[in-house]
A protein has these predicted regions:
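Conserved beta-strand/loop element in small beta-rich adapter and peptidoglycan-binding domains
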Residues: 33-39
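Short, basic/aromatic beta-hairpin or loop at an interaction surface
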Residues: 6-20
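C-terminal structural segments of small proteins and small subunits
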Residues: 4, 10, 42, 46-76
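Short alpha-helix capping/helix-loop boundary micro-motifs
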Residues: 23-27
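Helix-centric, low-specificity signal for extended rod-like, repetitive segments
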Residues: 20-22, 36, 49
Length: 76
């Protein structure tokens, strides 16, 4: 698994794990970052824009580094 912040623009992945302080983990899970959720990097920068469940969400890259994803090339 790799941090979500390392995905390239247009690349997709599936959430595998969310790390960090319990409040951050809870907030991200409420937004849909649960195991198996499909995510897409739409824009890198400040903020990063992520596609998740038909929505576009903006995050600091530091927060996205705590979301670990599986990318298709890694799925085996």
């Amino acid at each position: 698994m790799v941090p979500l912040s390392l995905l390239r623009v247009g690349e997709t992945g599936c959430v595998g794990e969310v790390l960090g302080h319990v409040d951050l983990v809870h907030r991200l899970r409420e937004m849909g970052f649960y195991d198996g959720a499909k995510v897409k990097m739409i824009r890198k920068g400040s903020p990063c824009i992520i596609g998740l469940a038909g929505q576009r969400l903006g995050f600091r890259c530091d927060d996205l580094a705590r979301v670990l994803v599986r990318i298709p090339a890694m799925a085996s």
